Amino acid sequence: MAVLGRNDTCPCGSGEKYKKCCIDKEKLNFEDPKKSIYLEDIKKLDTHTIISRLKYYRIDFNFDEFIENIDNYYSAANLSDDWYQKYQITADGREEDFIWMAAWVLWNRLTDSKDCDEELDEKIEEGYNMLSKNNQEEASSIWLDVWEDFKNRIEKEGHNSLEELNRVFESDLFLSNWITDLEMNLHDLGLKNKDYFKKQIKFCRDFLNLLPESKDYLIQSISKGEAAAYIHLGETEKGDIKFERILKKYPNWTWGYIYWGDQYVLLDDSASNKRKAEQIYKLALQNGDIKKMEDIDILKDRVKEVANH
């Protein structure tokens, strides 16, 4: 392990001894091999100190080269992997964590072209944290910003499905779970503020246009979300047409019919909307493609519910 002594020359290039130069700036105890290095600790260091430490590990860091090369990467971990290929890095053990986390911190500080995968992963988690605090609006704001980054990457790399994007995204997250949570959160907010239905429509339309080869359950989920948003905005004809199109593609998708009818039940308590919902449920019952008895029973229950209220 590379150990920096107090009397060694400071890696910042000043020519001074480490104890007389940057020792007080470095809040991390690099000399303790048992001490873990955390991202929050590195964020507290100034840029000069971070770069000095990278140079100490024999990484010939150059501002202009770093900024120019960022466009070739999406992950700070992948960037640091290439440093290991290019330089004879002396970091060992827990010190190796410093390398990729330093790349992440410098990425955030020195460029605003795009967020790295690690930052996007953290923002997605931050959105979930906001949801746990019942701050749905902040969660949506964070997540829609992340989606914009993903859109740029999808267009640049030519991905056609969410599965393709997930394979290249450096994270343990399942993007399919996050995508459906984002869509549902926009819908829930739309029930309180109709502007969010417009955001839901835009998100759903972007997803379907950019990632049309995603798995069927995602196409179904996002398509019904778009159609439902139109109905709640009062554009019922457009919403109905979109439900009809998705059900033409998936004729035995019972829950597509149920979700369609439910939107009219949720709109208001008017007799006309109840009749509309009943017509949709009965349309599904008349559909010869729906054969499962459990699905048929659910539809019959829905018909009884609207008839009795």
Task: Describe each model-derived feature in a short phrase.
Residues 93-98, 167-192, 234, 266-276, ...:
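Alpha-helical linker/edge segments of TPR/alpha-solenoid repeat scaffolds
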Residues 1-48, 95-101, 255:
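Acidic/negatively charged segments and metal-coordination signatures
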Residues 92-104, 138-162, 192-205, 232-239, ...:
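Helix-turn-helix repeat elements of alpha-solenoid scaffolds
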Residues 279-309:
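Terminal, low-structured helical/coil segments at or just beyond the last alpha-helical repeat
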Residues 29-79:
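Extreme N-terminal leader/anchor segments
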Residues 109-114, 149-175, 189-194, 205-219, ...:
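Flexible helix-coil transition and linker loops at the boundaries of alpha-helical arrays
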